[in-house]
UniProtKB/Swiss-Prot annotation:
Coiled-coil residues: none
Listed name of the protein: Protein FAM216B
Pfam families listed in its UniProt record: FAM216B
Organism of derivation: Bos taurus
InterPro entries registered for this protein in UniProt: FAM216
Region Disordered, annotated ranges: 92-121
Family the entry assigns: Belongs to the FAM216 family.
Superkingdom classification of source: Eukaryota
Length: 145
């Protein structure tokens, strides 16, 4: 019984390796048919390195942080920040739903390729009237004259 506990304890410390998501357009190409499974995994790992998804997630996080910062400074209201964040979340959900479920390396079946590009979230922050906190350079120059 002690051996089983030690074995389970060792498994908890093993780092989790994320699965490689393979788009249908890449998995169904005739070029990959002649490759072995190891070569395909290597190719998919290279595809993962050049994947735009981590950059896209970082951009989303940066945008949300920017919204929070603008709200703290008083440039936008809580309602405006929440509305823009909701638009970002909804458009991200729509884009991931449009792309369909991603397949992993072990699965291999014929499928169709996607014909439409995935949607990118768009949120326009409405400009508010000038803030009373930060006067513009133009108003400073007028006061000096």
């Amino acid at each position: 019984m002690g051996e089983k506990w030690k074995r389970q304890q060792k498994l908890c410390n093993v780092p989790h390796i994320p699965r490689i998501r393979v788009p249908r357009s890449a998995s169904d190409t005739p070029l990959l048919k002649d490759l072995t499974q190891g070569q395909q995994r290597y190719f998919y790992s290279i595809m993962r390195i050049y994947s735009p998804r981590p950059q896209w997630e970082a951009l989303q996080a940066r945008y949300l942080h920017s919204l929070q910062h603008q709200q703290l400074l008083g440039y936008i209201t809580q309602r405006e920040a929440s509305a823009c964040a909701a638009v970002l979340r909804d458009s991200t959900k729509r884009a991931s739903a449009k792309a369909g479920p991603h397949r992993t390396v072990p699965q291999r079946a014929a499928g169709r390729t996607r014909t439409q590009p995935s949607a990118r979230p768009v949120c326009v922050i409405p400009l508010r009237a000038r803030s009373t906190r930060l006067p513009s350079l133009r108003s400073r120059a007028v006061h000096k004259l």
